[in-house]
Design a protein with these regions (language model features):
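Alpha-helical structural signal in soluble globular domains
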Residues: 1, 48-52, 75-78, 97, ...
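Glycine-rich beta-alpha loop elements in corrinoid/cobalamin-binding modules
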Residues: 2-125, 331-333, 337
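Residue-level recognition of beta-strand->loop/alpha-helix junctions
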Residues: 6-14, 174, 212, 238, ...
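Residue-level signal for the nucleotide or nucleotide-sugar donor/cofactor binding architecture
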Residues: 15, 124, 184, 215-218, ...
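Radical SAM enzyme core and accessory elements
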Residues: 25-29, 339-342, 349-443
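Conserved C-terminal portion of the radical SAM core fold
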Residues: 29-31, 197-209, 231-240, 244, ...
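N-terminal [4Fe-4S]-dependent radical SAM core
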Residues: 100-103, 109-159, 442
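Radical SAM [4Fe-4S] cluster-binding motif and immediate context
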Residues: 132-297, 317
Length: 443
């Protein structure tokens, strides 16, 4: 981390726009990480900042500017340059005074024209990067972050970058981290964890937010052997292809929970999205985790290529058979830069002008297949949650664990949030039905 720099995450820390402007007066260079969904709003922020500080240098990083840097630079004139894909060393080069035309992996304007410098090679030596936990400790209040299925407070970090899986819908490997799987040494990861345990004793859980944490068995078991003596509680991502021995090593080393992308309970859809996994393997994986006492948070997606009303029902039934502790159900989003986006674009399946959220930030379906209306997919997301969590077994599991852990206050807060979102989702479904009925009547 550059001396004098600062990591600012305004929203969770309730830092107002006026306060952000005040903070920026002490800086010469601003790097903004943007997402596909936040891109329009972030452009407006950048324009306001440019109006306030005309001499401030502004750089954007993230998927939307990586996938179409020409459009980004032409849309937002507040931007001085863009870093494509990994940006760690590009921003350091600029901060250290290197001219734009000598920095790899960036795009910028020169004489009114967009210029794309040669790509920067992917970072191979991840151990050379600074420990993010030191930066978080210095600049962030981790109590401001809450993920319902993780212990509170938690800290997230990475032990690898990239993902060799070819899932057609997944944004990060296709736009930012790449498919080449690169790893930190197990010694470096264990040293950081030991350091944080000593310096940050209030943290209750560490989350490895790797694209695919345990894809290599030997490396995972080696890392677990070094984490086990630290007696930490941690969680990670996982694919269903992970075998029992690896899961056991993780459990013995302090792993508590796995975030798992099951995506669908329909075999053909798993093939369509190049998931590299089967329904049968997913069942075996869930059984192994249950046997070992590992908690699973399962991710599911409705509206993937090949989806039908029957396949949606198959996925809901499949999820209930797996009976994992918590789930997240998303509608399929075709992010620019992904194979799914090209598939949906070429076939004319994208609706709503590719708008993925409403004005309040709630997900909306923007892919519509013949015979599967987008409003039906949204309705089934709503029904999926209800059928899953309002089962007596599922509800009691969540409540009993909160009682055992002394987390009733948190359960109350999260239940209120869940019911609020459920109410908003229900309203969206009703409004879509009403609009459809009105359109049918007018026709």
């Amino acid at each position: 981390m550059l001396e004098g720099s600062r990591l600012l995450d305004a929203n969770p820390h309730h830092i107002s726009w006026l306060k952000v402007v005040e903070i920026l007066k002490d800086y010469e260079f601003l790097v903004l990480f943007t997402s596909t969904i936040a891109w329009s709003g972030d452009q407006r922020w950048a324009e306001k900042i440019r109006d306030t500080y005309p001499k401030l240098k502004i750089c954007f990083v993230g998927p939307p500017v990586t996938t179409d840097p020409d459009q980004a630079l032409n849309e937002c004139h507040a931007i001085d340059f863009i870093c494509r894909r990994e940006f760690d060393y590009s921003v350091v080069d600029f901060a250290n005074g290197k001219p734009l035309d000598q920095i790899l992996g960036i795009s910028y304007r020169k004489n009114g024209q967009v210029v794309h410098n040669p790509d920067r090679p992917q970072i191979e030596d991840l151990d050379a990067l600074p420990w993010v936990t030191d930066i978080y400790k210095r600049d962030l209040d981790v109590t401001k972050y809450n993920v319902p299925f993780l212990l509170h407070p938690f800290v997230s970090l990475y032990s690898t970058r990239g993902c060799p899986a070819q899932c057609t819908f997944c944004l990060w490997p296709q736009t930012l981290s790449g498919h080449a799987w690169r790893k930190r040494s197990t010694d470096d990861v264990a040293a950081e964890m030991s350091h944080v345990k000593e310096k940050w004793p209030a943290v209750k859980e560490f989350f490895f937010d790797d694209d695919t944490f345990n894809i290599q068995k030997a490396r995972t078991i080696e890392l677990c052997a070094k984490l086990k003596p630290l007696k930490l509680t941690w969680s990670s991502t996982s694919r269903v292809t992970t075998d029992y021995d690896t899961l056991k090593a993780m459990r013995d080393a302090g792993c508590r929970l796995l975030i798992v992308g099951f995506e669908s309970g329909d075999p053909q859809i798993l093939k369509n999205i190049k998931k590299g996994a089967t329904v049968e393997r997913a069942r075996d994986f869930a059984r192994d985790c249950h046997k070992l006492g590992l908690t699973i948070h399962g991710d599911f997606i409705l509206g993937l290529p090949g989806e039908t009303k029957d396949s949606i029902r198959n996925t809901i039934n499949f999820a209930k058979q797996l009976d994992v502790e918590t789930i997240q159900v998303s509608v399929a989003h075709a992010f620019p830069g992904t194979e799914l986006f090209e598939y949906a674009r070429v076939n004319g399946f994208i609706t709503n002008g590719n708008k993925m959220t409403d004005d309040l930030g709630h997900q909306i379906a923007h892919i519509e297949y013949p015979g599967l209306p987008a409003d039906y997919v949204m309705e089934m997301v709503h029904r999926f949650y209800d059928e899953y969590f309002f089962r007596p077994k599922a509800a009691w599991r969540v409540v009993s664990k909160a009682i055992a852990n002394g987390d009733l206050k948190r359960l109350y807060q999260e239940s209120r949030s869940f019911l609020k979102v459920r109410s908003q989702r229900s309203k969206m479904v009703r409004e879509a039905r009403t609009q459809k009925t009105a359109e049918a009547a007018s026709a």
